[in-house]
Amino acid sequence: LPSVAGTALHAMALAQFWPSAPPTRNRAVLVHSAAGGVGSMLVQMAKTLGCGPVVGVVGAPHKVEACKACGADAVVCKAGRRDWWDEVDAASPDGYAAIFDANGVATLRRSYDALAQTGRLVIFGFHTNLPTVSSTLSPWHWLRMAKGMASMPPFEPMDLVLSSKSIHGFNLSFFADETDLVDAYMAQLLAWVAAGQLRVA
């Protein structure tokens, strides 16, 4: 619970939906890898905090129902498709107030483009940049990672200002020095679990 749900709650805080959200018109949320550990938590938290529509993206057909069970208003399955972003755009024609992305180079630029004015892109991982092997990395794996790093999309500061968009990134290592923040997060998470608003299984 602490690492997975803590990651999700901090992402929601960076998106300004917790502990209290501003009364903005657009409260649409897009969650990548929405059937995974952090993603499923983000979907549940977004619904609990009054976001909507909450749109989840999954990578396989068998994950669609799991994402819906977490409360997603719409689920986009990208397996074997090149046009899945069209479905993402159609689910929230005015763009998204927040997009949560742990994919890395594969989706970052398009995620940024899908933000509404004042929208926030929250980045907490780069799993498409990493090799999917458990053994020693080969020279090919290192080359692939280098190519991914070189392909990272640039984000122009002037564009951030003109569009009123923002980008936030984090990893949990900073939690070690923020015990008060961790205590606040744990109190909220346990309250949601006790109220049946957050499923951790």
List the predicted regions and their residue ranges.
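Terminal helix/beta-alpha structural elements that buttress the NAD(P)+-binding lobe
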Residues: L1-A201
